[in-house]
Amino acid sequence: MFLATLYFVLPLLDLLMSAEVSGGDRLDCVKASDQCLKEQSCSTKYRTLRQCVAGKETNFSLTSGLEAKDECRSAMEALKQKSLYNCRCKRGMKKEKNCLRIYWSMYQSLQGNDLLEDSPYEPVNSRLSDIFRAVPFISDVFQQVEHISKGNNCLDAAKACNLDDTCKKYRSAYITPCTTSMSNEVCNRRKCHKALRQFFDKVPAKHSYGMLFCSCRDVACTERRRQTIVPVCSYEERERPNCLNLQDSCKTNYICRSRLADFFTNCQPESRSVSNCLKENYADCLLAYSGLIGTVMTPNYIDSSSLSVAPWCDCSNSGNDLEDCLKFLNFFKDNTCLKNAIQAFGNGSDVTMWQPAPPVQTTTATTTTAFRIKNKPLGPAGSENEIPTHVLPPCANLQAQKLKSNVSGSTHLCLSDNDYGKDGLAGASSHITTKSMAAPPSCGLSSLPVMVFTALAALLSVSLAETS
């Protein structure tokens, strides 16, 4: 009985372990595509799938009729077994646009093209604590909670940037196009956006975040923080477009659509979690937010009196889509996950440093806020960058460190979910009602080997009992 048990269980364990390893070693979409094209069966299915996608916009004959639909469905199912299906991209990578083009061609085919879902970017899983260790201008909050500097932290951050060669180089690179006026225009908005993306992609977070998320005690500081991205050029326009129309425009651009999906994924609020973030990771949320800067969906602080942010849009002329529009806009304005992440960076705290419980479990692999997107005609194929068809509150770390160092003080700089009003100020409550949906399946198999070991132990106990 014992040998029979080993005979059946060990091969299964080996299979699961190998699957776990391969799932964690996920290829980027450029490499996965190259790998697929070298394999005849995969290449054939991939080309078929691309024809199916193209057919949605050009009425290609392959997409008409039941036989064609079956062929498209067969190609989809076959590619689910390939590394191309689970490929991801890295923000700022050398071939990012090409990688995202491949990802969305697969994603639109396998999941549909009407909703933003999972992020196309490989998870970074960084921690704010990694940034704090290298930030020279943030006060030692843990040791001197009562004695926070009365100076301008945003000004200090700008000075620190000028002392760093990389930060100074890329900051100057965006200041010039964002402040140089053109004929009949305030600036060259396209060049300004591109330079801003490079700044947040290339400059270490200790400097870029220091300027964008600096903690403030007065209007002079908050206004400097709001002016970080030169909003007169990168953010403001003569008129505010409807937010759903702006989202439609964003969706036709590989970079913008990807950064927006990343923001939905990593800044998803969850009131039951320790941090008010579903992902329980402030650093990933701040990275996703900063990734939107330099796209048509560029967000910024609404005013100098709160942490509320929003893209340059409103919900006028929404008609029957007013509810969807407000839901989209409020995901930015009333996002307690993002607000707590900004607070945490300014305070020098990090929920993941003391997290006493695992993230909230949901019934889906990844829960994101999904918004209806109207189908729009796509630009000409080949155009660059265009898509053709718990237990403790967020302040607990500060409190714990205060007790450890025996320093008295207030933790009023860190607010909980109920402290935020619609304008981001203390004293009112806000709640964001969102819809959820499942994302593409991931390769998370880490619990399976444990289950197999448990089953093996049980079978061994039974076999030993029988032999005795």
From Swiss-Prot:
Pfam families assigned to the protein according to its UniProt record, in alphabetical order: GDNF (PF02351)
Topology of this chain in the membrane: Lipid-anchor; GPI-anchor
Disulphides: C36-C42, C154-C214, C161-C167, C178-C192, C187-C233, C216-C221, C243-C313, C250-C256, C267-C285, C277-C337, C315-C325
Annotated Sequence repeat ranges: 25-113, 150-238, 239-342
GO BP, one annotated term: nervous system development
Keyword Glycoprotein: yes
Lipid-conjugated positions (GPI-anchor amidated serine): S430
Tissue distribution of the protein: Expressed in the brain, in hippocampal neurons (at protein level). Isoform 1 and isoform 2 are expressed in heart, brain, lung, liver, kidney and testis.
Keywords: Cell membrane, Disulfide bond, Endosome, Glycoprotein, Golgi apparatus, GPI-anchor, Lipoprotein, Membrane, Receptor, Repeat, Signal
Signal sequence annotation: 1-24
InterPro entries for this protein: GDNF/GAS1, GDNF_alpha, GDNF_rcpt, GDNF_rcpt_A1, Glial_neurotroph_fac_rcpt_a1/2
Main localization category: membrane
GO molecular function, one term: glial cell-derived neurotrophic factor receptor activity
Coiled coil: none
Chain residues in the propeptide: 431-468
Residues glycosylated per entry: N59, N347, N406
GO cellular component terms, A-Z: axon; external side of plasma membrane; extracellular space; extrinsic component of membrane; Golgi apparatus; multivesicular body; neuronal cell body; plasma membrane
Entry superkingdom: Eukaryota
Complexes and interactors: Interacts with GDNF ligand and RET: forms a 2:2:2 ternary complex composed of GDNF ligand, GFRA1 and RET receptor. Interacts with SORL1, either alone or in complex with GDNF. Interaction between SORL1 and GFRA1 leads to GFRA1 internalization, but not degradation.
General function of this protein: Coreceptor for GDNF, a neurotrophic factor that enhances survival and morphological differentiation of dopaminergic neurons and increases their high-affinity dopamine uptake. GDNF-binding leads to autophosphorylation and activation of the RET receptor.
Name of the molecule in the record: GDNF family receptor alpha-1
Species of origin: Mus musculus (Mouse)
